């Protein structure tokens, strides 16, 4: 079996929180490392560096146009969210809202991951994220990663201290790339 040509694809990684030094951004580190190891070109959408508008609010849409362009050029998307109060983050939803309707995510293969402080993980937020993304036409692939008790998994250095979780996070790249280039 031939190895897929990972360099032929472009991936967009979406950080679904604007909190500095968040556990969600830490969970993306092994994924970003895996993309780099495999020489996969990628773009990171970091909402802390953007000024996105809430629906119905008039204003400058420069950053919305920027993320629409980035996502429209992607062959696949990796979407992350923390679980806040039993839900995906408002920031993750705001990013989705700024991608338009019909959404530029329609028809895009995606993998999703969530992090939560509780022992139940990010199951609720991932269910909601999957529903919303599917509704707008994204192809959400099986195998989401939910990181429970996230404060015990990632150290202050940002590194994942659980080899099983790190393997699953890195595996999201393979799931996505296998779909894009079977």
Predicted regions and their residues:
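Short amphipathic alpha-helical patches
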Residues: 58-59, 91-94, 118-122, 136-139, ...
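Mobile beta-alpha loop/short-helix "lid" or hinge segments that flank ligand
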Residues: 43-54, 101-103, 136-156
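N-terminal beta1-alpha1-beta2 submodule of the flavodoxin-like/Rossmannoid cofactor-binding fold
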Residues: 1-101, 159-182
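A glycine-biased structural micro-motif
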Residues: 8, 106-107
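A short, flexible beta-alpha/helix-coil linker loop
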Residues: 17-18, 49-52, 112, 117, ...
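Short, glycine-/small-residue-rich phosphate/pyrophosphate-handling segment
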Residues: 109-149, 163-164
């Amino acid at each position: 079996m031939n190895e897929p040509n990972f360099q032929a694809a472009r991936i967009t990684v979406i950080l679904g929180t604007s909190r500095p030094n968040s556990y969600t951004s830490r969970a993306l580190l092994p994924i970003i490392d895996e993309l780099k190891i495999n020489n996969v070109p990628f773009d990171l959408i970091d909402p802390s560096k953007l000024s996105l508008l809430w629906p119905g609010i008039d204003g400058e849409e420069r950053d919305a146009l920027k993320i629409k362009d980035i996502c429209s050029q992607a062959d696949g998307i990796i979407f992350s969210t923390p679980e806040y109060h039993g839900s995906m983050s408002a920031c993750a939803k705001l990013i989705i809202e700024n991608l338009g309707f019909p959404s530029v995510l329609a028809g895009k293969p995606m993998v999703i991951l969530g992090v939560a402080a509780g022992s139940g993980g990010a199951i609720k937020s991932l269910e909601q994220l999957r529903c919303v993304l599917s509704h707008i036409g994204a192809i959400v692939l099986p195998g989401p990663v939910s990181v429970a008790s996230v404060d015990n998994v990632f150290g202050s250095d940002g590194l994942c201290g659980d080899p099983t979780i790190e393997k699953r996070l890195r595996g999201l790249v393979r799931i996505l790339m296998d779909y894009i280039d079977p």
